[in-house]
Amino acid sequence: MVHFTAEEKAAITSIWDKVDLEKVGGETLGRLLIVYPWTQRFFDKFGNLSSALAIMGNPRIRAHGKKVLTSLGLGVKNMDNLKETFAHLSELHCDKLHVDPENFKLLGNMLVIVLSTHFAKEFTPEVQAAWQKLVIGVANALSHKYH
């Protein structure tokens, strides 16, 4: 179980409250698919993924990125109970989608990068540390069903 201090929770929510879910979600998922192209196999029904430009301009990628960040928002609201919050998604990704759990960590790292570009001045090392702790906690919660 991950424990967040009051300061870490405040650092996370101060950024989260300003996040444009579609923009940041689409950019995060798009970067994942570009930087780690093997992850594209999970999105073969999403249309044209032939280039970075095609991926970043793909409306289905943006929509799914928004969906991913909407789910992450549940984690932001329930930081002290990530395992239970993501139990259903862990089961879905393990049993039905067969997603390599390492991909959750990669996606979390992409999110931290995207947030740092969108909120450069506010994204201090302390804020980054809090976000890194959150995305690792979420990745571990999503990986729980695999163990």
Swiss-Prot record:
Disulfide bonds listed in the record: none
GO molecular function, one term: oxygen binding
Globin domain span: 3-147
Tissue: Red blood cells.
Pfam family name, one: Globin
Function description: This is an embryonic beta-type chain.
Name this polypeptide is given: Hemoglobin subunit beta-H1
Record organism: Mus musculus (Mouse)
Gene name of this polypeptide: Hbb-bh1
